[in-house]
Amino acid sequence: MYNNYNLCHIRTINWEEIITGPSAMYSYVYNFTSPERACTPCDKSCEQGCWGEGPENCQKYSKTNCSPQCWQGRCFGPNPRECCHLFCAGGCTGPKQSDCIACKNFFDDGVCTQECPPMQKYNPTTYSWEPNPDGKYAYGATCVRRCPEHLLKDNGACVRSCPPKKKALNGECVPCDGPCPKTCKGVEKVHSGNIDSFKDCTIIEGSITILDQSFQGFQHVYRNFSFGKRYEKMHPDKLEVFSTLKEITGFLNIQGDHKDFKNLSYFRNLEVIGGRTLTEYFASLYVVKTSLVSFGLSSLKKIYSGSIAILENKNLCYAQSINWTRIKKSSEHESLLSNNRNESECIKDGLVCDEQCSDEGCWGPGPAQCLSCKNFILGNDCLQDCTAPGIYQADEKTCKVCHEECDGSCIGPNTDHCKKCKHARDGPFCVPECPASKYNDNGVCKSCHGNCVGGCEGPENNIGPNGCHSCDKAILNDHVPEGCLQKKESCPDGYYYEWVSPLEQGPLKPLASKAVCRKCHSRCKKCTGYGFHEHVCQECTKYKRGEQCEDECPADYFADANKLCIPCFSECRGCFGPGPNQCYKCRNYKIYIDEDTDGNTTSFNCTETCTPEYPHKIFNPDSEPYCSLETAGLIENELQPAILAGVAVFALAFLVVAAIIMYFWRVRAKAKENTVKMTMALTGLDDNEPLRPTGVKPNLAKLRIIKEEEMRKGGILGYGAFGNVYKGVWVPEGENVKIPVAIKVLHDGTGANTSKEFLDEAYIMASVEHPNLLQLLAVCMTSQMMLVTQLMPLGCLLDFVRRFKDKIGSKALLNWCTQIARGMAYLEERRLVHRDLAARNVLVQTPNCVKITDFGLAKLLDINEEQYKAAGGKMPIKWLALECIQHRVFTHKSDVWAFGVTIWEVLTYGGRPYENVPARNVPELLEKGERLPQPAICTIDVYMIMIKCWMLDAESRPSFKELAEDFAKMSRDPGRYLAIKGDKYMRLPSYTLQDEKEMIRNLASAMDGPEALVDADEYLQPKSRAPIPPGLSASSTSGSPPNTPVKPCWPNGKPLAADSPTPQNQQNWDRELLRYGANHRNGNVSSHEPGNSAQHGHYTPPNGHCGHVVGSDSTASRYCSDPLKMIDVRDCDVTDDCFDGEVNSAHQQAQVGNLKLDLPLDEDDYLMPSPQLPTNTTQYMDLIGDSKPTEMEPKRVNNGYRKYPEFLTIQGKTSLDNPEYIMSQDEGPLTPQTIGIPTPDLEKVLTNGTFGSQVRQRSSEEESDHEYYNDFDRLERELQPLKPLRKNETTV
């Protein structure tokens, strides 16, 4: 409001009462220089503001003064039940719809409604809509029975004009059949300037002309040669505006040429050409020199006047096939068709009518362009028959589409002709949705319950998902509707009537402004409101006390026959009547009527004090106090002496019996002790301490004590809390070797407890012996105590996976997991708890072999202990189980938790567990169920194993034996369990034997001496590779092997199997020869039983690398399936450790004939080439004969391995690297032996010939690093004549 000088009282109005909504805003501006006009105050009767003088102009309130129950509405008073109906606007005078001052929606005969009564209503009997006699039209906000004459009727409303797609017909708006009629004027020619004026036209008064200029554009020139408007180019698709055109009163002139102007489908709905005006040749259809290929005038039915001229259209087909007389109404005009495309060319290009068209021709290709159909017609399409889904046969030649509510076929056009309904079936009719009085039950409309109002969702007489939308009256139970009633039906017993607020929200919103029956209080049987006072409770369910209903009478009341609670006598504690002699118990004293105080049925009176008749108060502990004629002392004095005498006699008897029993027990125990002492003295076992054997096997591990001068310390490797770790060399006293070691030195000045823990670590390390556990070599007991262990050149596994992340594949990762699990399983078997397992405490010996170390926190459990409880000290929180952190309890299962974290570190390539979480917060996270996330490369199979390791219940975690088996199984198919990009191209960093030797040399470079460099494993477990002397028998092999140490692993970490019969392990090759010689000489064992022949040798193989005895005499250890089958790595169990057991031995052995071949494989099970032969020496048959003798090659020494002379070159004999070649023959078998076993008798070979002499003359410097399985100097195989092949192929 702006600058209203004469306006009074406007500032007194409360505008919040009037305007509503978020955009409501009141603004008052007064900019005059003179002060505002002084107005008279409002009348004293006004609450706040007024619109003028007098009480009649006071502002009335119906919003700001309402109760909260009337929220979002108005009211006629401040009380909760004085809310206006929701259909009211601006206030009301009562709660009904007829009490509104104004209506929010519609006003219908004095009542405010949501909408006007509909003009149609549903008849459930006929399943159809019928006119509603009470229907009204909406005229503005008023419901009227008839619309004013100047307005139209549309969908129950009075409108000024029809909406789109409807037309006025007899005062009503009806849907148009297709486009709604629109008449437009014709033009001289169509161009880009006027094309849009034809939009939605159905009739053109005049003609249509389309020329070349229509598409190419042109400059308009007036008759006085002045220039008009320039019209741009137009694409033929702009002619789509003519798709609604049905009639042209003049002619249709087409002379346009454009590459995209192929047909006249833009006029596809054109039905009539009037021909009121004609063009050249008196034509009403004139098509000359166009680029048309077909017409596309599929709806053209009549040309009333004029001829038809189709001329000079070089691409036009179909014109000759059309029966033009059927279209022309006038017979006076001819049809001119000339110089169009040759009909034979059209046929050649397939531009002919569809087979469903009749002989009258067509407008273009397809069944929709026929003038008439050969069989049936459906709309504009010609069909073979009317059997397709969704159509039916209307007459002999016509098919029609089923009603849109039909799902599939039908027999007629209406909704009751459908065989199946698309949405729902209401009686015989298909409907898009069920009417309001019915619900959809699996496609069938069924009637709602009779009490439902506004529709339903199911048959139940209730408001809910399977019942009514609303009802006139509902029965409530705990604020939830449980049934509906008719509007005039009364509430059942136990319920009371209540009115629901019109602004109700929640489950009662469908019942707003309606009546409900609420359940009475549980104590009331009939009521008028909620409560259990007689004001609202008409009848009690159980008992009534005073003015209230009760579930039961109180303790000091009793119920009469009418269930009324009546008070007991004042001295009673519970009663069954009102008198003093009807009490269950008394508050003070009883007075027995018949003096029988012990009977339960004895009657008594209750009294506050004893009466003069019964003056004495008796307090009996077994009963209530009562009044008596006699005093209590007389009764007690009579009984007291007898009671005391009985107690004394019983106590004396008990003491005598107890003393006798103790005496005899002591005598027997003394006699038994003397008997034991005498027996021990007689047997010589007199000892003061009794024996308590545990059955535990003795620990026979050896602890080697060395001197300080045997140690050579080098650079420092790491720091610890109690000492430092140095790399160094150990030179054992009296031996000519140097061993690279790691030396852990205790700090000076450490306490006695630290030294004890240092020795405890030494004890545990010396007690373990496993290929995946770092073993103690020796202890130096100087002032600074030293622990000597094997040197792990590649550092810890944590740094290794971080450094070589891009080179580590899935197989290596799973092998490491398996090895760690096997090492921990060994500790579990020996009752050792590690307590500090982590990736930093796993050392890498080779890329294929890891070892667990750092036993500083490890504890050995006694035979009767299942757990260790730490007293204090630091703990690696993020690696520990929850019970370790909270209770300091350590078991093997807590090591399993740490194993899961260690595996997580490895599979995340050195990730930090709980990296951004302080250690003190880790226990809380674990209790809440949080665990380390799944590594990116890890499948759910591996992650589930980690989750099992992190179970809060320790007993639910797997054992290390189970973990080792699981990871061993996964390592045989690594790509299935770890998804690493480029996995098959990854190779671990090379760490060959030469690298290790070089490391040892560098380490000992400062300590030069004559000692030989030896690895710790070789020093502890040496192996012999001495050649076999001639004539040596099986019984002569019992001597000890020489001291020359041999590295028992291939450079890639694969060990040499101890029972291999190939020269790749010289010791076992010698043993095979000895077995064969002994068996051949004695004739005890067939050469076809290599598994059994090994049992006759007396040579005991030394332990394999890492401490396991390798080799087996059983056939199962040699083969994984058929012994005559070439073994594939998938058929065998693939080893994943750094030592060879039976599995590894089996999976590397191939079989040719009866001979096992131990072939060197790399980490991916590919055959490794031997480094023995020089690159310029062929390994195949010399067909040219210009190869040089191998004896001329210089003999080489490589890494300390023996070197044998190369193969002899004998004239006519050629070295051959294919062992099967000499086995194929057609002149009978050479010998029952396979390759690798000499054809002549072994004794002859060993005693004379080239073999024996060469063996005696060889030195260790001449021995080779690797030998092939067809070493000639051992077998003299080249001296055997080559036989022709038995078959024309080579068997592999």
Swiss-Prot record:
GO terms for molecular function: ATP binding; transmembrane receptor protein tyrosine kinase activity. GO terms for biological process: ERBB signaling pathway; negative regulation of apoptotic process; neurogenesis; positive regulation of cell population proliferation; regulation of signal transduction. The modification Phosphothreonine is found at T675. Residues 711-978 form the Protein kinase domain. The chain crosses the membrane at residues 642-662. It catalyses: L-tyrosyl-[protein] + ATP = O-phospho-L-tyrosyl-[protein] + ADP + H(+). GO terms for cellular component: basal plasma membrane; receptor complex. ATP binds at L717, G718, Y719, G720, A721, F722, G723, N724, V725, K744. Disruption phenotype: Reduced adult size and ovary size, and prolonged developmental time. InterPro entries: Furin-like_Cys-rich_dom (IPR006211), Furin_repeat (IPR006212), GF_recep_IV (IPR032778), Growth_fac_rcpt_cys_sf (IPR009030), Kinase-like_dom_sf (IPR011009), Prot_kinase_dom (IPR000719), Protein_kinase_ATP_BS (IPR017441), Rcpt_L-dom (IPR000494). Signal peptide: none annotated. Disulfide bonds: none annotated. Pfam families: Furin-like, GF_recep_IV, PK_Tyr_Ser-Thr, Recep_L_domain. Residues 1022-1066, 1253-1292 are annotated as: Disordered. Its EC number is 2.7.10.1. It is a single-pass type I membrane protein. Keywords: ATP-binding, Developmental protein, Glycoprotein, Kinase, Membrane, Nucleotide-binding, Phosphoprotein, Receptor, Transferase, Transmembrane, Transmembrane helix, Tyrosine-protein kinase. Residues 663-1292 are cytoplasmic. It is found in: Membrane. Residues 1-641 are extracellular. The modification Phosphotyrosine is found at Y1166. Upon binding to its ligands, transduces the signal through the ras-raf-MAPK pathway and is involved in a myriad of developmental decisions. Involved in the determination of adult size, ovary development, and development timing, especially during queen determination of honeybee larvae. May have an important role in the prolongation of longevity in queens. Belongs to the protein kinase superfamily. Tyr protein kinase family. EGF receptor subfamily. This is Epidermal growth factor receptor. It comes from Apis mellifera (Honeybee). The gene is Egfr.
